[in-house]
Amino acid sequence: MATSNDIKNGTILKLDGNLWQTIEFQHVKPGKGGAFVRTKLRNVTSGKVVDKTFNAGAKIETATVDRSEYQYLYQDGDDYVFMDNSTYDQITVPGVVVGDAANFMLENQNVTVAIHEGAPLYIEMPPSVVLEITYTEPGLQGDRSTGGTKPATVETGYQIQVPLFLEQGTKVKVDTRTGDYLGRVNE
């Protein structure tokens, strides 16, 4: 059994019969009164986000989660198929569990899959990925100096905002947490 002082980002807690992933945490020591830990938790199964406060040192129950490297193979309807890089076993992960990670996953890409008691909980993507722009409107000659943005579709089908000077076929770096354009990649 752990205490609330052990909470870190990514910690999986068991509360009220559900599993919750810590998104944010803050240890607060007010000038008056006892210290506490303020957290933002995401329900692993439903995706619901709640704020919860724990007294400092309060006993909490954490869940054991195995994180392993998997290779994304293909999409099968609403499900996604991954292969364990060490055992070559294939697992099927429901689209609800994959969530927004689907916007940035390419076939044969390595991701981390978190598994609890044999069931996949969530997909951990790298902080950024390189994707190719498959469609965007051409930028107009006069627009290049304004610093504006335009919509662009990347190879996964996800739409991002990119600078006006970028063209179809350009590889760009995209933040997997926010979906924001980070920069152009020269290869």
Curated annotation (Swiss-Prot):
What CDD domains does the record tag this protein with? S1_EF-P_repeat_1, S1_EF-P_repeat_2
What is the disulfide pattern of this chain? none
Q: Which UniProt keywords apply?
A: Cytoplasm, Elongation factor, Protein biosynthesis
Give the primary localization class: cytoplasm
Matching entries from PANTHER family are given as: ELONGATION FACTOR P, ELONGATION FACTOR P (EF-P) FAMILY PROTEIN
Question: What is the role of the protein in this entry?
Answer: Involved in peptide bond synthesis. Stimulates efficient translation and peptide-bond synthesis on native or reconstituted 70S ribosomes in vitro. Probably functions indirectly by altering the affinity of the ribosome for aminoacyl-tRNA, thus increasing their reactivity as acceptors for peptidyl transferase.
Which family is this sequence assigned to? Belongs to the elongation factor P family.
User: Which GO BP terms sit in this record?
Assistant: peptide biosynthetic process
Question: Which cellular compartments is it found in?
Answer: Cytoplasm
Q: Which protein are we looking at?
A: Elongation factor P
Does Protein biosynthesis appear among the keywords?
A: yes
The cross-references to SUPFAM superfamilies, in alphabetical order and at most eight, read: Nucleic acid-binding proteins, Translation proteins SH3-like domain
Q: Which organism is it from?
A: Kocuria rhizophila (strain ATCC 9341 / DSM 348 / NBRC 103217 / DC2201)
